[in-house]
Amino acid sequence: MKKTIITYGTYDMLHIGHLNLLKRAKALGDYLIVGVTSEDYDRSRGKLNVSQSTEQRIEAIEKLDFVDEVILETHKNQKAEDMVKYGVDIFAIGDDWVGAFDYLNEFTHVEYLARTEGISSTLLREEKFTTVKLGMVGLGRDANRFLKESGFVSNIEVGAVFGDNLDEVEKFTALSNIEHGSSNYKEFLKLPFDAVYISTSLELHVEHIRTALEANKHVLCENPLALGKEELNGLFSLAKKRKRLLLVALKSAFAPAFNQLIKELEQGTLGEIKEVRASFTKLYKEKGYKKSFYEHGATNLLLNYPSLLIQKILGKSKSTAFFDQCEDGYDISNRVITTHKNGAIGLATVGIGMKLEGDAVIAGTKGYVYIPAPWWLTKTFHFRFEDTEKAYTFNYEFQGDGLRYMIAEFSSLIQRGELESQRLTVDEMMDINDVIVKYNEQKRS
């Protein structure tokens, strides 16, 4: 009778240690199944520095002639499910996990195998890749959060900061133990770093991005990148010309659970998706933000988040209608209705002068998904159907406030030499931003 063995791992930069462990696992039986962790699952459990894509790691394992089957591991409960699904006789794992998987003895026999000393993916990454050096542009709340979260991503290092006020810059660098600080942007960009994170006033984004790209820096910038279509097109054209990465800081797009949600929806479980509804409200005034910030309005400040969810699921919009409420010359709320392919509808509600439950619903012909508030910090989502017994829930780890997943994506893309994220493509960024552009054009007309 065939004896089935299963094991799991990331297998980043496949090395002799991996090979030895896999061969030891195969020696325990006849049929070896290898589970390769998805990039999103790795990030959900704090593994933020994986250098190879999921596809590259799977391909490396598939080339091994002694491996009989390769599967993708996407969530923490999958191991127990796989033991039953594949009729596994032995679950094999490295002895650095001794005791961690004893609970699986309920389903199969667990075998802890000796690992090869002196070799690891971490060591290989340190040898092959240099740490991404980054400069921060802006000293506001976002900058402080970014600096804290970047400490959890091992392949990036903040080494410089720019601000308009030199006294504030010097105070910030001293408190944060950052080597370089400057109040002259052009001089700042001459410093030896690879990339910038921009969190300045919205009206300064375009100029700060353009100047950074011209200085051959990769750019991660708070949203929106620009309020005009021509400006945005110009920035992406410049990034392409300079062969530099330009990415908008929509952190939801890089959260493990958010990406798993999109993959689940692509399987067609809900049937044809007819409507996506999402809300995002934030009372900036009550939180003590300056008027110069929140007077940009709810649409410019918040709409890109609901638009992200709608665009990722329904694609590019065909028509857009705005229903805003304005006070003191800016919109305190806006209900935005978009139409899409096959008559699907997107409903986005944003507000800075009203409070609303920040949840999201994705409605299909066979069922719906409910994402509880705050949906943009996606941790949990529920699939629900007419038959309530068929309902199920996904729960993912979500560490910090989500910035570390975005930072990990940004730094990994730079190290790989990739100029576009598959989690948030250039076309998607332009489609999302286009809704804001249309609103501002309508206000001016």
Positions of the model-derived regions?
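Rossmann-fold dehydrogenase core element
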Residues: G234-K251, E272-V276
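Beta-loop-alpha module in the N-terminal Rossmann-like domain of NAD(P)-dependent dehydrogenases
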Residues: S176-F236
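Predominantly a Rossmann-like dinucleotide-binding segment in NAD(P)-dependent oxidoreductases
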Residues: S252-A321
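C-terminal helix-rich "cap/oligomerization" subdomain common to oxidoreductases
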Residues: E187, A195-I198, K341, E409-S445
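N-terminal Rossmann-fold NAD(P) dinucleotide-binding loop
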Residues: H18, A143-F146, H205
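N-terminal Rossmann-like dinucleotide-binding module
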Residues: T130-S176, S445
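Contiguous beta-strand/loop segments that form the cofactor/metal-binding neighborhood of enzyme cores
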Residues: L301-L302, S307-T378, A408-R416
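Nucleotidyltransferase catalytic core that binds NTPs
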Residues: M1-T131
